[in-house]
UniProtKB/Swiss-Prot annotation:
GO cellular component: extracellular region
Protein's UniProt name: Toxin Pg8
Signal sequence segment: 1-19
Pfam families: Toxin_3 (PF00537)
Organism listed in the record: Parabuthus granulatus
Alphabetic keyword roster: Disulfide bond, Ion channel impairing toxin, Neurotoxin, Secreted, Signal, Toxin, Voltage-gated sodium channel impairing toxin
Database matches in InterPro entries: LCN-type_CS_alpha_beta_dom (IPR044062), Scorpion_toxin-like (IPR003614), Scorpion_toxin-like_sf (IPR036574), Scorpion_toxinL (IPR018218), Scorpion_toxinL/defensin (IPR002061)
GO MF annotation terms: sodium channel inhibitor activity; toxin activity
Amino acid sequence: MNYLLVLTLASLLALGVNGKKDGYPVDHANCKYECWYDDKYCDDLCKKRKADSGYCYKLNISCYCLGLPDNAAIKDYGRCRP
């Protein structure tokens, strides 16, 4: 019985977990994408990056993606380097 439990736990750990995250997508220079209130532009941009959806966050005038894969680049604490 214990072997079955250990084997099941080891199998789950070996498979890994594919999570999703939300955030501002960035280009190669760590700059956010400006949207100027265009939700369709942001939704298309986010879906190209394999997100579930996206919208224009109007306070920052930047695209925000929902459900991005874990390996997608999002805005962090670094500056934009144009």
